[in-house]
Amino acid sequence: MSSTFTSLRGLATRLFAGGARPSPSSLLLPNKPATAALPTAIQHQQTASYASKGKSGPPAGMFSGQKAGSKKSKGPKQVDPRIINILRHFAVLSPKRIPPPLRFGRNRYLRHWTIHRAWLLFRRQQREQRERILMQQHQSMSNACEELRNTEGPGTRETGYLYRVAMLKNGVYGLKSIPIEYASRALVETPGRQAWNHEWKR
């Protein structure tokens, strides 16, 4: 901290050594160029030193805050490859890449519209039929569970014993449960050719 304060004091001493110190009002004015803070005498001294060395004057931009010898970089600007990948990805969605709408005659458009609507109607009927079958299966399982809950036995067991045993699922996922050959069978909408192999042994 002390070295920073010393360097600032030395800089202020060199700036205000050649002329009068600026007034506080001049320092508070907004949008003041950087050359206003330098005394005019320092600028004249630097210009005279360049003239004594055989030069016409200080380099351009010395008093305007521009770095001496700074040049604009030439050549193409380097672009981040990640930006290029993003632009290529979204270029497919550009309006220039979207194909124009189909232009049909009146009769051909009517045929196209009829086939399209018929296909949508067929898919909706299939979806509703599948949902109806699933709803019936769920209702059947619910009725079976309700029947087990109201059933007595076996033997002297109390009412609902079979329902509790069915909901506990003890031994279903063990070695003595359903054979893996049947448990891993792919679920299909139609029954298999052989529903159960009674002669199978582990």
Curated annotation (Swiss-Prot):
Gene3D superfamilies for this protein: 6.10.250.3440
What is the annotated localization of this protein?
Mitochondrion
Subunit composition and interactions: Component of the mitochondrial large ribosomal subunit (mt-LSU). Mature N.crassa 74S mitochondrial ribosomes consist of a small (37S) and a large (54S) subunit. The 37S small subunit contains a 16S ribosomal RNA (16S mt-rRNA) and 32 different proteins. The 54S large subunit contains a 23S rRNA (23S mt-rRNA) and 42 different proteins. mL40 is binding to NAD.
Q: Which family does it belong to?
A: Belongs to the mitochondrion-specific ribosomal protein mL40 family.
Which keywords label this protein? Mitochondrion, Ribonucleoprotein, Ribosomal protein, Transit peptide
* GO BP, sorted A to Z: mitochondrial translation
Lineage top rank: taxon: Eukaryota
Protein name in the entry: Large ribosomal subunit protein mL40
- What functional role does this protein have? Component of the mitochondrial ribosome (mitoribosome), a dedicated translation machinery responsible for the synthesis of mitochondrial genome-encoded proteins, including at least some of the essential transmembrane subunits of the mitochondrial respiratory chain. The mitoribosomes are attached to the mitochondrial inner membrane and translation products are cotranslationally integrated into the membrane.
Q: Which gene encodes it?
A: mrpl28
The UniProt annotation puts the region (Disordered) at: 42-79
- Report the principal subcellular site: mitochondrion
Gene Ontology, cellular component aspect: mitochondrion; ribonucleoprotein complex; ribosome
InterPro entries (UniProt xref): Ribosomal_mL40_fung (IPR042831)
**Any GO MF annotation of the entry:** structural constituent of ribosome
